[in-house]
Amino acid sequence: RITLDAVDGGREIPFDVATDLILHRNRSLPFHPNGMTFTAWSGQDVVVERTFYSIGGGFVVEHGEDEHPAIVRDSAPAPYPFKTGKELLQQCSDYRMSIPEVAMANETTVREQEEVRGQLLDIWAVMHACVERGCSRCGVLPGGLHVRRRAMKMHRDLVTRERIAPGKPEPFGSVDWLTVWALAVNEENAAGGRIVTAPTNGAAGIIPSCLHFAVKFLSPGSDIDSGTPGVDTGDDELIVDFLLAAGAIGEIYQQSASISGAEVGCQGEVGVACS
């Protein structure tokens, strides 16, 4: 039994996980499948009741009187707003800007550009660390299915192939790298490791895999025979632009459709990540 501390002069609330946390496995709240209602009781009387939804991508919204609560956004209006891909491309055309430039301009209405860049590079660092862990760990993943990790062996085999034939990439070798990096992240997610929700946990392997691909195979200073690229690539601009563009596309889906696997299924969240 635990007690939730009083906040802002409120009361302490006794809370017993065994009896007070109730899971309704065959029921769903009206707005979204991932929902939770908090109810505080005083005897038989309800003192306060509030409902929250986890709608994917790290967004949490509260259910109020409005039947469809909206995500609370920053108060500063974006200078280049868009809700669809067509509107985004129109902004780029009208102002002769790239997608990353439009995204950065919108971000800098609420924070400095260097802060945005720093946060994006921090995201890359977490993605990279996740890939490295996934490519270096073996064994069986948690759960009753007893699934064995595969990314480490696949990664080791790819590195060996590069060493045997340096400078001579196989026709589909780059696809193999995409596969192993995505698998490494998915295995880390299954093991409870630290990942970046991009756009969701279930589809979190695709964006890091594509970004690693860009750094390894598309960066002007990259070495295609160097295995998995290091975290300090010397090409911060590519990384920042990649994540800004990915964020802009994800924003379109978040506003006009959904990025939540609970709402649109596994293929929906994976489809968003692949876009």
Predicted regions and their residues:
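C-terminal regulatory domains involved in ligand/effector binding and gene-expression control
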Residues: I2-P166, W177
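Solvent-exposed alpha-helices and their adjacent loops that cap or buttress functional pockets
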Residues: S28-H32, E187-A190, D235, A273
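Structural beta-strand/beta-sheet cores of well-ordered domains, especially the beta-sheet scaffolds
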Residues: N34-M36, V48-R50, R194, A203, ...
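Accessory "access/gating" subregions that flank catalytic or transport cores
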Residues: E114-C266
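Active-site pocket-lining segment
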Residues: E269-S275
